[in-house]
Amino acid sequence: MWTAQSIPQGFKNPHNTKAGTWAKLKIYQGELRFAFLDEAGVVQSEHIFSAEQQPPFIEPQAWHKIVSTSGDIECQLQFYCMPQDYFYKKYQLSPTHSEILAATPYLQGGRALDVGCGQGRNALYLNQLGQQGFEVDAWDV
């Protein structure tokens, strides 16, 4: 949880999210003045957000900054990505194999065995697919 005193300075300067990463700022208390920018740092739009008027998801690679906050601000930042990128972004595993991604729309879930799984990137992806997910046994040889 950030307060007016603990918001990192980098978020008050122009910055953008990484490719494939969405940001979501949740405001619990107070107000925050926020600007969307172009790549040159020119303000494209400015908004005031609060607990009643939450900021939208910030698109990947969108330039933005926190302009100012009220003294009582309490907020928290979370990052989101596509399921196939999660373990790559969070744990630096190699990306999910392209053939697994191509087959995903046709899979119904169930059980899977991943022999020679390495660090488990494909098994982890298949396991996280929710209702269509797999119970996966993974063995590296």
Regions found by a protein language model. Name each.
Residues 119:
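Conserved SAM/SAH-binding loop
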Residues 91-109:
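Conserved alpha-helix/loop element of class I SAM-dependent methyltransferases that forms part
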Residues 40-60:
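Short acidic-glycine-tyrosine-enriched beta hairpin
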Residues 135-140:
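Conserved SAM-binding motif I beta-strand of class I
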Residues 110-116:
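Conserved class I S-adenosyl-L-methionine
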Residues 60-83:
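Ligand-binding loop in jelly-roll beta-barrel domains
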Residues 2-19:
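Conserved short histidine dyad/triad with adjacent acidic residue
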